[in-house]
From Swiss-Prot:
Oligomeric form and interacting partners: Homodimer.
Known function: Degradation of inorganic polyphosphates (polyP). Releases orthophosphate processively from the ends of the polyP chain. Prefers long-chain length polyphosphates as substrates. Can also hydrolyze ATP and ADP substrates, but lacks GTPase activity. Cannot hydrolyze pppGpp to ppGpp.
Keywords annotated in UniProt: Hydrolase
Native source organism of the sequence: Mycobacterium tuberculosis (strain ATCC 25618 / H37Rv)
Catalytic activity: [phosphate](n) + H2O = [phosphate](n-1) + phosphate + H(+)
InterPro entries: ATPase_NBD (IPR043129), GppA/Ppx_hydrolase (IPR050273), Ppx_GppA_N (IPR003695)
Molecular function per GO: exopolyphosphatase activity; pyrophosphatase activity
Transmembrane regions listed in the UniProt entry: none
Name of protein: Exopolyphosphatase 2
E.C. code: 3.6.1.11
Family named by the database record: Belongs to the GppA/Ppx family.
Residues spanning the signal sequence: none
Length: 319
């Protein structure tokens, strides 16, 4: 069987991301040959936590990005596409408007294509598959944490998922609910920590963190923390991928981000401008997870992967 060119699109609460890759015969299990990767911050989940609805302007931003992605599918001759919508799309009452838009835009490139909503369990499975495909077994079992805008997936396993939980907390949701001042007040940060612990509690009952040997962090908050810990003057995905961040360095960066203004965060060289207003919330989630992993599993280091649910989606198209 020849290689097949596939496209994966992950539409989350904060970003919409595209991967075009070759899969199939001649490649190792879990291996992809990247053709194109791209991320756009569209904040689809803007206000969803408060209103339960997608805002018209958020759908418009997402449509603009998806239209560009559809053109790239045609340009790169993608044969199959799978677009998944995660936390934000699970929570809204007007999601039919969103899915009709995706069918209209994607259908122009590959007829019959449209986004699909996936469960938290499916999201965890795809994130795990994308993250551990190239890690081998030396550091297993892995606890993979995919920290998104609206939810955080926590997954334990080696080659297959042993336990997983999708916690109803992410950097956008936490920021909109708790962190209203600029910079956040001590009271706001304290309230945010309590909410994070409350939302993580069922995950900690479900996923036996004490069995883990390696903590793998995915998505924009995690990769940006690695970039800052490495004092990068520009975002370098190759240097971030599989980087290891010592616990002390991780907590120092988190504390610094939480106390900064949005303008100060935006001025940091590796910071994506669409992430500056919510990464403080993400840093609080990371701090709480770091504490739990240190206490429960003795893990005091974060391994950061650039490969995540997007890679898992692409691999799912390989059969």
């Amino acid at each position: 069987m020849a290689l097949t060119r596939v496209a994966a699109i992950d539409c989350g609460t904060n970003s919409i991301r595209l991967l075009i890759a070759d899969v199939g015969a001649g490649l190792a299990r879990g291996e992809l040959h990247d053709v194109h990767r791209e991320t756009r911050i569209v904040r689809l989940g803007q206000g969803v936590d408060a209103t339960g609805r997608f805002a018209p302007e958020a759908i418009a931003r997402t449509r603009t990005a998806l239209t560009d992605y559809a053109e790239l599918l045609t340009f790169h001759h993608a044969e199959r596409v799978r677009m998944v919508a995660t936390s934000a799309a699970r929570d809204v009452v007007n999601r039919d408007v969103f899915f009709a838009m995706t069918a209209d835009v994607l259908g122009a490139a590959l007829p019959g294509s449209a986004a699909e909503v996936i469960t938290g369990a499916e999201e965890a499975e795809l994130s795990f598959r994308g993250a551990v495909g190239e890690l081998g077994s030396a550091g297993a079992p892995f606890v993979v944490v995919d920290l998104g805008g609206g939810s955080t997936e926590i997954v334990l396993g080696e080659h297959e998922v042993v336990a997983s939980y999708s916690a109803d907390i992410g950097c956008v949701r936490l920021t909109e609910r708790c962190l209203h001042s600029d910079p956040p007040t001590l009271q706001e940060v304290s309230t945010a920590r309590r909410l994070v612990r409350e939302r993580l509690e069922p995950a900690l009952r479900t996923v036996p963190l004490e069995l883990a040997r390696t903590w793998v962090g995915l998505a924009g908050t995690m990769t940006t923390l690695s970039a800052l810990a490495q004092s990068m003057t520009a975002y370098d995905a190759a240097a971030i991928h599989l980087s290891r961040v010592p616990g002390a360095d991780l907590l120092e960066v988190c504390q610094r981000l939480i106390g900064m203004t949005r303008k100060q965060r935006a001025a940091l060289a590796p910071m994506h401008p669409g992430r500056a207003d919510v990464i403080g919330g993400g840093a609080i989630v990371v701090e709480e997870l770091a504490r739990e992993l240190r206490e429960r599993a003795g893990i005091d280091q974060l391994t950061v992967s650039e490969h995540d649910i997007l890679d898992g989606i692409a691999l799912s198209l390989a059969g």
